[in-house]
């Protein structure tokens, strides 16, 4: 069950970033601007922000049918992109997958709660969430290797097959009902208001807005921004692969260390500075090796920042942990949309775009300074109350 779900999560990320690693090639193929191609990826955070709350409600009321439909829509979107060699068909397929994404990604905790024993749920959630990283890596590898040099159709066929197989498996395994669970996928209104009233929660959301926003902007636009410097699609894809691989390894190592030492403030301050200097290096460095070092360093801090923030938010929220996690994801996707659109405006001025991302990163400095250790404890020493409900 969890494996099938994890692979569907991978498929959503694979289809999300299909065109991001080959933006210039896609623009030539469809006869549109690179800005238009950017919307093939940017539609995902946009629809996530719009649909996350309705998706959670659907999952709470009709969990198995909603999740099965989400998986089926992912597969359908992959095949719709094969309907014709036009931008309209590509966008239609991306919209279908983007509609399914909040349903699929919001289901992980509830799926583990209904189908796994209590002592296996944390592992199940980790396995399910790992699919997102697998999908991102696949997209960044397959795009330049299968879709470059006029072979976009071949890439779309392979990705459609990779989407339909796990979707079919998920539909089949969901025919078996799970056990009743107290896990909720929806954002609960009263809990959300209580959480948002806590300054530490707003600080965490601001940090994830900045960090996830920069990551999404880089994943969407790096190839286009580096093309004028003579960096090939394959090389740009390799840079992003290095970033995600380094970040994935760091996600397994750094969050427990940071939590054990209550070092969230120091880590976030370092992540902000590395993000800023990394963006400046990507814009100014004349050598590919320096750019590679910069983006790998960014991956090491930006990707682990998300689970660190999620853990802190859930500890702050107490029994409203599910709502806290959903709010953090909403903030991250909103940041992804806003920062990616900012870069899109500057996409024909690469240095300005990289400097703008560096400036966005610096917005996290005052936010990081507000963090206390442990999270939620005011500087006066009295812990903020966890949210109940």
Predicted regions and their residues:
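Cytoplasmic helix-loop-helix junction between adjacent transmembrane helices
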Residues: 93-131
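Juxtamembrane intracellular "pre-TM" segments in multi-pass secondary transporters
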Residues: 175-204
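C-terminal transmembrane helical hairpin of 12-TM major facilitator-type secondary transporters
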Residues: 264-309
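Helix-loop-helix hairpin linking two adjacent transmembrane segments in secondary transporters
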Residues: 127-175
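Helix-to-loop junctions at the C-terminal end of transmembrane segments
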Residues: 51-63, 250-263
């Amino acid at each position: 069950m969890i494996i099938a779900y994890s692979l569907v999560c991978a498929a959503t990320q694979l289809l999300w970033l299909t065109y991001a690693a080959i933006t210039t090639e896609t623009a030539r193929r469809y006869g549109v601007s690179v800005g238009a191609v950017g919307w093939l990826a940017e539609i995902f955070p946009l629809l996530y922000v719009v649909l996350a709350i309705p998706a959670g409600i659907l999952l709470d009321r009709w969990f198995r049918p909603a999740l099965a439909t989400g998986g089926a829509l992912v597969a359908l979107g992959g095949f719709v992109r094969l309907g014709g060699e036009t931008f309209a068909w590509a966008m239609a397929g991306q919209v279908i997958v983007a509609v399914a994404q909040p349903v699929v990604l919001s289901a992980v905790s509830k799926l583990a709660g209904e189908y796994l024993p209590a002592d296996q749920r944390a592992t199940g959630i980790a396995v399910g969430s790992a699919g997102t990283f697998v999908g991102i890596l696949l997209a960044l590898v397959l795009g330049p290797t299968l879709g470059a040099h006029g072979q976009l159709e071949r890439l779309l066929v392979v990705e459609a097959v990779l989407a339909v197989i796990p979707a079919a498996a998920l539909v089949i395994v969901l025919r078996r009902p799970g056990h009743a669970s107290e896990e909720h996928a929806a954002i609960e209104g009263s809990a959300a208001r209580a959480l948002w009233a806590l300054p530490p929660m707003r600080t965490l959301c601001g940090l994830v807005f900045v960090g996830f926003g920069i990551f999404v902007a880089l994943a969407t636009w790096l190839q286009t921004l580096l093309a004028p410097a003579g960096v090939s699609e394959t090389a740009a894809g390799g840079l992003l692969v290095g970033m995600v691989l380094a970040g994935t390894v760091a996600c397994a190592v750094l969050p427990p260390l940071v939590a054990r030492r209550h070092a969230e403030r120091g880590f976030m301050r370092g992540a902000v500075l590395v993000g800023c200097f990394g963006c400046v290096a990507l814009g100014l460095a004349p050598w590919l090796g320096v750019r590679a070092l910069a983006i790998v360093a960014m991956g090491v801090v930006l990707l682990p920042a998300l689970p660190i923030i999620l853990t802190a938010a859930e500890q702050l929220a107490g029994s409203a942990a599910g709502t806290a996690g959903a709010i953090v994801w909403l903030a991250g996707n909103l940041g992804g949309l806003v920062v990616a659109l900012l870069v899109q405006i500057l996409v024909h001025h690469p240095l300005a775009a990289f400097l703008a991302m560096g400036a966005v990163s610096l917005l996290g400095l005052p936010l990081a300074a507000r963090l206390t250790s442990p999270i939620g404890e005011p500087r006066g020493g009295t812990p903020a109350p966890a949210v109940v409900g």
